[in-house]
């Protein structure tokens, strides 16, 4: 069901309850959370915290549209890669307690720069194939984010989806991240076109520039072709959360997120 949502990220001065109340006050009706919001990996409570968080958001009229897994499938040691896959399985199980079936996922981060770039694809492909085996069991779907440097290419994302071959693997379409990576706007529009049928979740984000020249702004104030992204995704039948992500200078008090909500309310 379509909703205007927001990510629990870049809300300085708000704890989780404060975020929930402020976001609801602005008008948001769904949110994406981080795995740490609902689960303490070192003290696994079998989903009890996740259920409490779900009740918190229910109480302010919001649902949880997705949870970010915080996974990293680019690992120098095989044992660490296997541990990440095992952890991902548990994350999928825990996330179901929030009421969503969307696991917003990264590819990998190559922390420490220990893995050659030529090995990244194989590691991520094998990992997502392994994960595909238990998605049906937990009735969840993977929304692969175009995030960082390992997954920020729409042609590659589509290739991964096709090679994994699971209808439960799609994308979290971040409208800005491709530009941050360095793609030009025409190429980004191409990514919107080819990935639209595979969109499970969104990050509606705007800004200008790439890498060290990147500046985040409220929706509608940057250079991203947001209306074209909406057109492509809607045409493909997407009916999920339109989730605002704001990285501009007006984070205090949720001011930037107020502006994003106003744009989304007028355009989606």
Annotate each predicted stretch with a short phrase:
Residues 17-18, 51, 55-63, 74-170, ...:
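Active-site acidic/histidine proton-transfer and metal-coordination neighborhood
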Residues 253-268:
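C-terminal helical cap(s) of enzyme catalytic domains, especially alpha/beta-barrels
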């Amino acid at each position: 069901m379509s909703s205007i949502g927001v990510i629990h990220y870049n809300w300085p001065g708000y704890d989780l309850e404060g975020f929930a109340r402020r976001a609801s006050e602005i008008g948001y009706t769904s949110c994406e959370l981080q795995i740490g919001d609902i689960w303490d990996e070192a003290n696994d409570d079998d989903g009890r915290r996740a259920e409490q968080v779900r009740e918190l958001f229910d109480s302010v009229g919001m649902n949880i549209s997705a949870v970010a897994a915080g996974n990293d499938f680019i690992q120098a040691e095989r044992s660490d890669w296997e541990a990440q896959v095992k952890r991902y399985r548990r994350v999928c199980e825990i996330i179901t307690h929030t009421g969503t079936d969307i696991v917003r996922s990264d590819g990998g981060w190559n922390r420490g720069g220990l893995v050659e770039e030529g090995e990244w694809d194989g590691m991520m492909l094998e990992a997502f194939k392994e994960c595909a085996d238990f998605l049906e069991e937990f009735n969840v779907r993977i929304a692969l984010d175009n995030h960082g440097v390992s997954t920020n290419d729409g042609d590659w994302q589509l290739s991964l989806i096709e090679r994994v071959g699971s209808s439960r693997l799609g994308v979290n379409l971040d409208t800005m991240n491709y530009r941050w990576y360095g793609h030009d706007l025409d190429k980004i529009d191409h990514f919107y076109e080819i990935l639209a049928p595979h969109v499970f979740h969104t990050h509606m984000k705007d800004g200008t520039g790439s890498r060290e020249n990147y500046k985040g702004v409220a929706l509608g104030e940057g250079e991203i072709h947001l209306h074209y992204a909406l057109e492509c995704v809607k045409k493909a039948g997407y009916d999920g959360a339109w989730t605002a992500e704001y990285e501009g200078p007006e984070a205090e008090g949720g001011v930037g997120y107020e502006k994003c909500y106003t744009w989304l309310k007028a355009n989606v």
